[in-house]
From Swiss-Prot:
It comes from Escherichia coli (strain K12). It comes from the Bacteria. Pfam families: 5TM-5TMR_LYT, GAF, HATPase_c, His_kinase. It is found in: Cell inner membrane. This is Sensor histidine kinase YpdA. Member of the two-component regulatory system YpdA/YpdB, which is part of a nutrient-sensing regulatory network composed of YpdA/YpdB, the high-affinity pyruvate signaling system BtsS/BtsR and their respective target proteins, YhjX and BtsT. YpdA activates YpdB by phosphorylation in response to high concentrations of extracellular pyruvate. Activation of the YpdA/YpdB signaling cascade also promotes BtsS/BtsR-mediated btsT expression.
């Protein structure tokens, strides 16, 4: 009995050594990451198999010799590997351990039994991994280990040259080997404690993502470069990153942290890695690589931002040290990117709705603007006596202009030719007022055939006449041009007035305009929200040019009538 007790202590001693090694292994972040994953790559499975195979080989080497047999914890190593990482690890480890056990004692009493049960232990452990709930694996693992050791004892008795020798060996090593299988449960429980840490870490990451969302929510009400920069600062500070960036499909919208100076001189185009993430709609992780422009960065996480199923940008997280992108950080960042995507989509929808409301208000103002009606009626009354035909045409222009405005819907997409007809009616009335002072030139590409939101061009024409031509003493020219430009259509309004004040351009870009100039800012907002970039405003010598671009989406036209230029 004393000898059996000593052997049991030897088994627990070697199992304890394995537990200690595992304890230190799970302190290593890379190994802990393997434990957290639900699926592993072949390379990762190969690494884990090598670790548990070494445990199994060491168990055989350190075994206590007894009558041609070895008291060891080989089955514990094989079972633990299979239960924790799946059948491939268990079976391959079992085969390696079994072959090694056979080769070090070819022809030995226990060589064949140990070879057989080592492989069987790998198969059983793999089955436990696939079929048994995690909470029960440690218990079933103990039973599986005891079953394998019991089978080993039976095979030793059967395989021994004499039954007496087999029984003698089993009587000495059977109890220690079978009871030692309890250590399988200890190992599995140790790893499950890491799983508990994973769940706690996931809870912390979820709370962190929600905290960041709460802090950034007010900033998404009015999205601009400054608000996005503050969002990046909050994310960087809360997750202790070295740099954070947000991009759209072409440019870096905001960048905060290490390497920020690389994005301050207009060189803000996205990197090839970011382009790849957007093209494939997949997360890209680089854990040991230099960033595109910042060699100090060695870890990078690029997550696509989605709106209505389309990638509209990315969230990028950087660290100076390598291997900083953990699975928990990735999961948190993915959740955070989903929140940001939702907030951006809601913000865009709200701004579109607000712009549509302002456009409707602007249309209503045009409909009932007493000054416009007063001037139009004055022009008509003056023409009645001098030129009745002109007066009749002006009445027709005015009625068609008012009917067009009344029938408008919020951001309705209309044929660009229909929009230009409405502008011609407006200009006809204005030309009646200004006479020879106002000349309008139409530079329209007749091949252009697309749809645009209503009331995008008319406010620009009104701005050119009222703020460009009217203040001048002499004659003035307004040019309206529509032309194809690659895969887009360029729409521009140019006047020969005094030229726009540069401060007005700055205020438009900063979204700050007085109430009496809401038309220009409204068009800038709507174009930017709908097509990604706002108005292009240039001060000329003389005059001003305001242009914007829309996609060249050809649509069928009911009538092929051309504009009367």
């Amino acid at each position: 009995m004393h000898e059996i007790f000593n052997m049991l202590l030897a088994v627990f001693d070697r199992a304890a050594l394995m537990l200690i090694c595992l304890f230190f292994l799970i302190r290593i972040r890379l190994f802990r990451e393997l434990l957290h994953k639900s699926a592993h790559s072949p390379k990762e499975l190969l690494a884990v198999t090598a670790i548990f195979s070494l445990f199994a080989l060491f168990s055989t080497w350190s075994g206590v010799p007894v009558e041609g047999s070895l008291v060891n914890v080989r089955i514990i190593a094989v079972m633990s590997g299979g239960i924790l990482f799946g059948p491939w690890v268990g079976i391959i480890t079992g085969v390696i351990a079994g072959i090694h056990r056979y080769l070090i004692d070819i022809g030995g009493v226990t060589a064949i039994p140990c070879f057989i049960t080592s492989i069987l232990a790998g198969c059983i452990s793999g089955w436990i991994n696939l079929k048994i709930p995690k909470a029960q694996r440690w218990r079933v693992g103990i039973l599986g280990g005891m079953l394998c050791e019991t089978l080993t004892m039976i095979l030793v008795i059967v395989w021994a040259p004499t039954t007496a020798l087999g029984i003698d060996i089993v009587s000495k090593i059977g109890i220690p080997m079978i009871l030692g299988s309890v250590c399988i449960g200890f190992i599995v429980l140790l790893v499950q404690s890491v799983e508990g840490e994973k769940e706690a870490s996931a809870a912390r990451q979820a709370k962190l993502a929600l905290d960041i969302a709460n802090k950034t929510l007010p900033l998404f009400r009015h999205v601009n470069s400054e608000s996005l920069r503050k969002v990046c600062e909050i994310i960087r500070d809360d997750i202790h990153a070295d740099a954070v960036a947000i991009t759209n499909t072409d440019h870096v919208l905001a960048y905060v942290g290490v390497g920020e100076h690389n994005y301050q001189n207009g060189d803000d185009f996205i990197s090839p890695t970011t382009r790849q993430a957007m093209n494939y709609g997949k997360i890209i992780i680089k854990n040991n690589d230099e960033a595109h422009r910042t060699p100090e960065i060695h870890s990078m996480l690029v997550i696509p931002l989605w709106e209505k199923g389309v990638v509209t940008g990315t969230l990028k997280i950087y660290y100076c040290h390598a291997h900083q992108i953990t699975s928990s950080l990735q999961e948190m960042a993915v959740g955070l990117s989903q929140i940001i995507s939702t907030q951006l989509e809601v913000s865009r929808a709200e701004q579109l709705r607000e712009m549509a409301n302002k456009a409707e208000l602007r249309a209503l103002q045009s409909k009932i603007n007493p000054h416009f009606l007063f001037n139009a009626l004055n022009a008509i009354s003056s023409s009645i006596r001098l030129n009745p035909d002109t007066a009749r045409q002006l009445i027709f222009n005015l009625s068609r202009y008012l009917r067009y405005n009344i029938e408008l819907k919020d951001d309705e997409q209309i044929d660009i030719k229909k929009e230009l007809y409405q502008i011609k009616d407006y200009i006809a009335i204005e030309q009646a007022r200004f006479g020879d002072k106002l000349t309008v030139i139409y530079d329209i590409d007749e091949e252009v055939n697309c749809c645009i939101p209503s009331l995008l061009i008319q406010p620009l024409v009104e701005n050119a006449i009222v703020h460009g031509i009217q203040p001048c003493k002499g004659k003035g020219v307004v040019t309206i041009s529509v032309a194809e430009c690659g895969n887009r259509v360029r729409i521009a309004v140019r006047d020969t007035g005094h030229g726009i004040d540069p401060k007005v351009i700055e205020r438009v870009e900063a979204n700050e305009m007085p109430g009496n100039k809401i038309g220009l800012l409204n068009v800038h907002h709507r174009v930017k929200l709908l097509y990604g970039e706002g108005l292009h405003i240039r001060r000329l010598e003389p005059g001003t040019e305001i242009a914007f671009y829309i996609p060249n989406q050809r649509t069928p036209v009911a009538s092929q009538a051309t504009l009367l230029l």
